[in-house]
Regions:
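Extracytoplasmic substrate-binding proteins
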Residues: 29, 43-123, 150, 202-224
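Alpha-helical scaffolding within the catalytic cores
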Residues: 40, 99, 106, 154-159, ...
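Short, structured coil segments at secondary-structure junctions
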Residues: 7, 50-52, 143, 200
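A short, structured surface patch at a secondary-structure boundary
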Residues: 1-25, 29-37, 148
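Short, Asp-centered acidic motifs that coordinate Mg2+ and/or phosphate
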Residues: 28-29, 166-169
Length: 224
């Protein structure tokens, strides 16, 4: 849908540009995460304001921005719509997301049992849990799913087996984009997990980080 406009953007890589290159581009506005404006990255917002460059930090990227919610993503989109004088388009994007949420709710209203979901990322010795304060967790709850291990930060494989989730979402970070199957195989082919019902039924799903962390317009992909 946006291929033509996207092709006109000077830089679209996953790696953040360095300070010198960013300044050479002479931006009017920098839109980023809280981490974008750290001293060792692109300097502080004050640094840019003194040079006449405006800044916008995504709400959910703030260190204390918990819980991270769909409502915050909607607000960011609407605020950017005001900045770029694209209010109607911003409202349309938010409306599409809300429509998807309402669609899921209406089609699961008759379920006697809510789908039980576990959202994990493999890092360190134990999988990290995306719990009740994460955007991914909020999406699961907004869609009337039951979020498992919602108060935990990590989880052992034995507990995963005990929970027997209806679906496991595996978060794929930028380092593994294009290698989603390798991430899925960490569950599907793991000797301790391969007999889970959700594995046998093909309900282990790759979830790109860009769709569930400070995701803005890409939140639609996370909801879908």
């Amino acid at each position: 849908e946006y291929q033509e406009q996207y092709s006109k953007i000077p830089y679209t890589g996953l790696q953040l540009l360095d300070l010198e290159t960013t300044m050479m581009l002479k931006p009017d506005l920098l839109v980023g995460w809280h981490s974008t404006f750290m001293p060792k990255v692109l300097r502080s917002t004050d640094f840019w304001h003194k040079r006449g460059v405006n800044t916008f930090i995504a709400r959910s990227s703030m260190i204390d921005a918990k819980p991270r919610t769909l409502a915050n993503e909607y607000k960011d989109i609407l605020d950017l719509g005001k900045i770029f004088d694209k209010n109607e388009r911003a409202q349309q994007l938010v409306g599409q997301m809300q429509q998807e949420v309402n669609f899921a709710i209406s089609h699961t209203a008759g379920y006697q049992k809510r789908p039980r979901a576990l959202v994990l990322e493999f890092m360190g010795k134990e999988p990290t849990v995306y719990g009740e304060k994460s955007l991914a967790g909020n999406i699961v709850k907004e869609l009337h799913g039951e979020l498992l291990a919602e108060k935990q930060r990590a989880i052992g494989l034995e507990q995963v087996v005990e929970l027997d989730p209806d679906v496991i979402f595996l978060v794929v970070t930028e380092f593994n984009y294009g290698h989603e199957q390798d991430v899925l195989d960490r569950v599907n082919k793991h000797k301790a997990l391969k007999n889970l019902r959700c594995v046998k039924e093909g309900r282990v799903v790759a979830l790109p980080l860009y769709a569930i962390y400070s995701s803005g317009v890409r939140t639609y992909d996370g909801i879908k």
